[in-house]
Amino acid sequence: MIRSAQRLLLTLAVVLVLPLSACGGSDEDDVRSASEDFVAAFKDENWEEVCSLMTDKSKAQLERAGQVLDANGGCEGVWEKASKFIGDKAKRQLDDFEIESVKVEGDTATVTTAEAKGQPTQLRKEDGEWRVDFES
């Protein structure tokens, strides 16, 4: 059970973090900024910032997954505990990712990268801010 939770959290980290980087245009600039902030916070292990850049539903889903790991401290506590299982190699991959495409439609955006191997990251505008949304 713990192994499956570890795999889930590693998969979430890869799916959420690797696909994020650059775009162009007004909403696209905002998506880019949110994406870059998310990646920087993840690399710095600034879990409070990482969680602030996630939708409320995404945080709730992460917290439910974290219950399997007995992670305390809400979203931040789950990321802190999960980071111990992610490993340095996965974290170093964040240094070498590149955006392939960005598509903004209303309050949702899709960001894809080569590193994500066909698994795009979704962002959603929530309270006027672009946030990572893995509930979509």
Q: What does each model-identified segment do?
A:
Residues 38, 42-50:
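Short helix-adjacent coil turns
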Residues 32, 47-102:
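Short solvent-exposed beta->alpha transition segments
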Residues 1-12:
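Bacterial N-terminal signal peptides that target proteins for export
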